[in-house]
Regions:
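Catalytic beta-strand/loop cores that center a nucleophilic Ser/Cys/Thr
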Residues: 1-56
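Short amphipathic C-terminal alpha-helix that caps PH/PH-like domains
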Residues: 77-88
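Phosphate/oxyanion-binding loops and surfaces in catalytic or ligand/nucleic-acid-binding neighborhoods
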Residues: 22, 87, 91
Length: 113
């Protein structure tokens, strides 16, 4: 069973950093991820959660959904996996034409079970 080191789960939450927001910020915080933030946020670059495409005569389905057990048993996520697998196997037709322009849409996580 997968158990990441920095996050065990909602029932055994391990706090790594706590901030006291009542104290004023006197120093600019060290941002070690500034380069990554610039790479992924400036210029409108999006990082897809899931995608399909054709490659060398075959079909490809990719998703990075799922980081804990509750995600893997969510019926919506399971249907997403099934649809993607069926597409990759050739059982489900879908338009895999690359998007010329992606419109951003906010998507909320499903409610907790």
């Amino acid at each position: 069973q997968y158990k990441p080191e920095t996050y065990v789960g909602p029932d055994k939450l391990r706090v790594l950093v706590s901030l006291d927001l009542s104290k004023p910020q006197t120093m600019k915080p060290l941002d070690r991820n500034a380069g990554l933030k610039k790479q992924y946020t400036e210029g409108g670059r999006t990082v897809p959660v899931s995608w399909i495409r054709t490659f060398e005569g075959g079909r490809v389905f990719y998703t990075n959904l799922g980081h804990n057990a509750s995600t893997y048993w969510n019926t919506t996520v399971l249907q997403h996996y099934l649809d993607g697998l069926q597409y990759a196997l050739g059982d489900l037709k879908a338009d895999a034409t690359p998007s010329a322009k992606i419109t951003r849409e906010e998507v909320l996580a499903p409610p907790a079970p």
